[in-house]
């Protein structure tokens, strides 16, 4: 009985862990993309401000 439950738990863990890892990975990737986009936006705004200052 204990052995069957143990194998069931292992199976469940395996079936839950892989999607969870995938979800976490996707989340990390999307947050990294968000951070990159933010950095890019900041960079562009700084460049725009700099060009405005040099035009004056």
From Swiss-Prot:
Q: What keyword terms does UniProt attach to this protein?
A: Secreted, Signal, Toxin
**Signal sequence interval, chain numbering:** 1-31
| GO molecular function terms noted in the UniProt entry | toxin activity
What Gene Ontology cellular component terms go with this record?
Answer: extracellular region
What does the record say about tissue specificity? Expressed by the venom gland.
Main subcellular localisation: secreted
Q: Does the keyword DNA damage apply?
A: no
**Where found in the cell?**
Secreted
Q: What does this protein do?
A: This synthetic cationic peptide inhibits the development of Plasmodium berghei ookinetes, kills intraerythrocytic P.falciparum, and is cytotoxic to the Drosophila S2 cell at micromolar concentrations. No antibacterial, antifungal and hemolytic activities have been found at micromolar concentrations.
**UniProt similarity note:** Belongs to the non-disulfide-bridged peptide (NDBP) superfamily. Antimalarial peptide (group 5) family.
Q: What is this protein called?
A: Meucin-25
């Amino acid at each position: 009985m204990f052995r069957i439950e143990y194998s069931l738990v292992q199976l469940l863990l395996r079936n839950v862990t892989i999607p969870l890892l995938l979800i976490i990975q996707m989340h990390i990737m999307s947050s990294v993309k968000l951070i990159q986009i933010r950095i890019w936006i900041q960079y562009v705004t700084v460049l725009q401000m700099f060009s405005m200052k040099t035009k004056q």
